């Protein structure tokens, strides 16, 4: 589909010129997607009028491009098998909901888990896409007994977390695939010293430094086997942004129950994607108090 040409034809009456007219092609494509998935255009139309309230000509041009994309879907002879796909309405349990993304849910789950365990939370990390916002979110939660530490590199971050666990807190570190490789030796140290540690691996494209903004789910074997010697640990994976909350809590429970590192696998789509999340009743969660051996 020659989207640029069709967009320029749709916005020609608004005299935007080729450069600015071509910028409306995203709305043309959105109109086609609205047709494909059987969605209404009214909400987007209202939003465009509000967004470009001071420039009504731009608003109308974008709206015209969106309608043109929708009409193209209705009238074009598209390849066999391409047609309207109806997405059923989501079935939600009664309750209070809010939007949540995966990294936010992971941070809250870690805090909730440490509260149920009755131990302070220490989070040491080195900024790395797409895990950086874990540090941002946890830094806002210091009133829940959270300590955050931005280290100079990945190895320093995980070693600080291991030290925090040795001192009676729960050491947690967050990273992506390249960082997990650098942390392997220190994770092995936590395994051999039987210290709890949670490693949040927000996966991205690889190998090596890879592509920070591309998502992959390719770190499973690294998480399970990527250490020298006999160094087994627990590996968990979240399914949705909201699920990150509950899996993070479970990671805390398992790490403190068995005194071992736990790797929590998420990915860039989960970390940055959002979904309606039912706010849980935290009082219904069963505490799992932790006792460190001192002898």
Predicted regions and their residues:
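Active-site cofactor/cluster-binding pocket
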Residues: 1-108, 114-117
């Amino acid at each position: 589909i020659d989207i640029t040409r069709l967009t320029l034809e749709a916005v020609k009456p608004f005299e935007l010129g080729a450069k600015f007219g071509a910028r409306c092609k995203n709305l043309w494509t959105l109109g086609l997607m609205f047709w494909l998935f059987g969605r209404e255009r009214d909400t987007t139309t209202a939003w465009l009028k509000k967004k470009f309230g001071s420039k009504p000509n731009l608003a109308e041009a974008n709206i015209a491009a969106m309608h043109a994309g929708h009409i193209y879907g209705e009238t074009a002879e598209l390849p066999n098998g391409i047609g309207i796909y109806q997405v059923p309405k989501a079935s939600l349990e009664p309750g209070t909901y809010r939007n949540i993304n995966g990294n936010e849910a992971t941070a809250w789950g870690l805090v909730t888990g440490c509260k149920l365990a009755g131990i302070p939370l220490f989070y040491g990390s080195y900024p790395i896409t797409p895990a950086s916002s874990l540090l941002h979110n946890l830094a806002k939660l210091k009133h829940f007994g959270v300590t955050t530490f931005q280290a100079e590199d990945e190895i320093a971050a995980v070693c600080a977390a291991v030290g925090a666990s040795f001192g009676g807190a729960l050491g947690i570190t967050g990273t992506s695939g390249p960082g997990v490789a650098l942390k392997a030796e220190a994770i092995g140290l936590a395994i051999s010293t039987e210290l709890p540690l949670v490693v949040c691996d927000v996966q991205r494209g690889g190998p090596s430094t890879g592509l920070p903004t591309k998502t992959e789910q390719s770190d499973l074997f690294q998480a399970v086997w990527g250490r020298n010697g006999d160094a087994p640990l627990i590996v968990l994976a979240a399914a949705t942004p909201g699920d990150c909350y509950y899996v993070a809590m479970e990671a805390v429970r398992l790490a403190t129950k068995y005194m071992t590192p736990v790797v929590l696998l998420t990915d860039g789509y989960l970390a940055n994607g959002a979904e309606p999340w039912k706010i849980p009743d935290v009082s219904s969660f069963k505490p799992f108090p932790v006792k460190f051996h001192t002898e």
